[in-house]
C-alpha cells in the first residue's frame, strides 16, 4: 500500500490562542503531488493545549481527481488511537472529485501529536494533484448550563390545529460565539413548501456534556468544511430530548440535508450514531412532538405518502434520509432509528388526531364540579357523569392505565407526574386540558 505525503506547515497551538469562553477553530491547508507518492510524511499538530475543552471536532475536505478521492483512505492518529475519516453522509454533491468527511470527535485528553495519513489502495501509478484542508473546532466552554428552552409563540396557521411548536434552544444561544440570530448565516435564504419530513442522525458522538457545543460543531463543519450557507438541518434533538433551532431564516426555509434534493422537505437530526446505539425515549418523544406540530400545521398526512422531486420519486411523508437517496448512498438515520419510523408515523398521526385536532376546553377553577374536577388536580380526579377514556400528556403518551379507581366517581392519579394533560371522556367529542400538580 502506497503512502501519500501531505505537505503542510506543522501547526503548534499555543496557550495564547485558546480561550474557551469562545469557540476556536483552525483551517489547516493540505497539498499532495505525485512526487511524494512513495514517501511517508505525517503532519504533527501539537494539541496538549486543548486540555480544558469539552471535545475537539475535526473534519476533512479533499479535492482531486475522482480516482484519488475514491481510492484513498484518510486517517488521523492521536495518542496511538487511529481514527478513520468516513465520507460524510450529509454531503449532497455528486462530484466524485471531492471528499468531505463526517466529523470526528476527539476526547479532550492530552494529545502530544496528531498524525494525518493518506494511503492509496490502488498500486498503479497515476497522476496525483490534490489539495484540501483539515478543519479543527473547539467549542466554547460549558460551565454555564443551557438557557431554559424558550416557549415559542404559536405559529400554526390552522385555527383547528392545536399542536404547539415545542420549546427549543435558539440559534442565538448555541450559536452565540458565531453571533447567530434568526437570519440565515449567508444570505439569501431560500424557501419551500414542505410536504415531507426527513429524519436524520448526526452519525457523531453518542455522549457529551456539551450538546449545544456539538450543535455548534455541526454548524462549523457545514459552513466551513462543506461550504454551505448555514447548518443543513432545520431542527436538531439531543439525547436528553432538548430541541435546537437549526438553519436560520424561519419557518419553511430550505435546508441542506437530502442528497441534493432539498425542496419540499424539512430535516430534523437526532444527535448520535444510531448504527451503534438506539435513540433515547426522550429523543423519540420530542421528535413525535415536532413532527406532529409540522404535519398538522402543513396539513401533511403523517402516515401517508406522495410524490417528491427526489429519488425514488415517491416517499412516505415521514421518511429517513436514505429513503430519498440512490441505493447504498447512506444508511442515515441508522438502523436503530430507521426501524422505529413505521411506529413513529402511526404515533404522530394519533398525536394529531387526539391532541392537535380535537376540540379542546381548558379547565380552570370556575369549572369546579362540572364534568371534571378538581381543577387543578393533585392526587385525584373525578367525573360524575362519564368514564375517563384517555389521559394523555403533551407528548401524546397515554397515562390512562395509571388511573386507579378511588370510588365510584373518582380516580387516584397520585402516581402520575405533574404537568399538562389532555383528558377525554367516553362518549364525549370534547377534549379537556387539565393541569396536574
Put a short name on every predicted segment.
Residues 22-29, 137-193, 197-202, 238-256, ...:
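Basic/polar, cationic surfaces and motifs that engage anionic cell-wall
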Residues 41-52, 70-76, 82-115, 119-125:
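Beta-sandwich interaction modules
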Residues 112, 417-420:
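A glycine-anchored, Pro-Gly-centered beta-turn/N-cap motif
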Residues 353-382:
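Residue-level detector of functionally pivotal "anchor" positions at catalytic/ligand-binding pockets or at interdomain
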Residues 398-416, 428-431:
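Glycine-centered tight-turn motifs at strand-turn-strand junctions
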Amino acid at each position: 500500500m502506497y503512502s501519500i505525503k501531505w505537505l503542510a506547515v506543522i501547526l503548534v497551538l499555543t496557550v495564547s490562542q485558546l480561550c474557551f469562553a469562545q469557540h476556536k477553530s483552525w483551517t489547516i491547508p493540505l497539498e499532495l503531488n505525485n512526487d511524494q507518492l512513495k514517501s511517508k510524511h505525517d503532519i504533527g499538530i501539537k494539541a496538549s493545549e486543548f486540555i480544558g475543552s469539552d471535545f475537539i471536532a475535526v473534519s476533512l475536505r479533499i479535492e482531486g481527481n475522482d480516482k484519488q478521492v475514491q481510492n484513498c483512505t484518510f486517517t488521523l492518529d492521536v495518542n496511538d488511537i487511529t481514527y478513520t475519516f468516513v465520507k460524510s453522509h450529509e454531503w449532497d454533491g455528486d462530484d466524485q472529485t471531492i471528499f468531505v468527511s463526517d466529523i470526528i470527535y476527539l476526547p479532550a485528553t492530552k494529545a502530544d501529536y496528531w498524525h494525518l495519513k493518506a494511503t492509496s489502495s490502488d498500486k498503479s501509478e497515476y497522476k496525483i494533484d490534490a489539495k484540501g484542508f483539515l478543519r479543527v473546532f473547539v467549542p466554547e466552554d460549558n460551565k454555564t448550563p443551557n438557557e431554559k428552552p424558550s416557549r415559542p409563540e404559536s405559529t400554526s396557521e390552522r385555527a383547528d390545529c392545536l399542536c404547539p411548536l415545542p420549546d427549543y434552544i435558539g440559534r442565538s444561544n448555541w450559536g452565540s460565539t458565531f453571533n447567530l440570530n434568526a437570519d440565515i448565516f449567508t444570505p439569501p435564504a431560500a424557501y419551500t413548501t414542505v410536504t415531507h419530513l426527513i429524519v436524520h442522525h448526526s452519525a457523531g458522538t453518542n455522549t457529551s456534556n456539551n450538546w449545544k457545543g456539538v450543535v455548534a460543531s455541526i454548524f462549523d463543519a457545514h459552513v466551513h468544511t462543506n461550504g454551505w450557507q448555514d447548518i443543513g438541518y432545520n431542527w436538531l434533538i439531543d439525547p436528553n430530548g432538548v430541541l435546537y433551532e437549526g438553519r436560520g431564516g424561519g419557518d419553511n426555509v430550505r435546508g441542506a440535508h437530502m442528497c441534493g434534493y432539498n425542496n419540499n422537505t424539512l430535516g430534523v437530526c437526532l444527535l448520535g450514531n444510531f448504527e451503534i446505539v438506539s435513540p433515547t425515549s426522550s429523543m423519540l418523544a420530542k421528535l413525535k412532538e415536532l413532527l406532529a406540530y409540522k404535519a398538522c400545521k402543513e396539513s401533511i398526512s403523517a402516515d401517508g405518502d406522495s410524490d417528491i422531486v427526489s429519488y425514488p420519486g415517491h416517499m412516505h411523508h415521514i421518511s429517513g434520509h436514505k429513503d430519498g437517496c440512490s441505493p447504498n448512498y447512506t444508511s442515515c438515520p441508522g438502523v436503530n432509528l430507521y426501524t422505529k419510523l413505521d411506529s413513529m408515523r402511526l404515533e404522530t398521526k394519533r398525536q394529531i388526531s387526539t391532541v392537535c385536532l380535537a376540540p379542546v376546553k381548558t379547565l380552570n377553577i370556575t369549572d369546579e364540579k362540572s364534568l371534571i374536577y378538581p381543577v387543578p388536580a393533585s392526587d385525584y380526579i373525578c367525573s360524575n357523569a362519564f368514564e375517563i377514556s384517555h389521559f394523555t400528556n403533551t407528548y401524546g403518551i397515554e397515562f390512562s392505565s395509571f388511573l386507579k379507581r378511588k370510588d365510584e366517581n373518582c380516580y387516584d392519579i397520585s402516581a402520575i407526574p405533574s404537568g399538562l394533560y389532555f383528558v377525554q371522556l367516553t362518549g364525549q367529542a370534547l377534549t379537556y386540558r387539565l393541569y396536574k400538580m
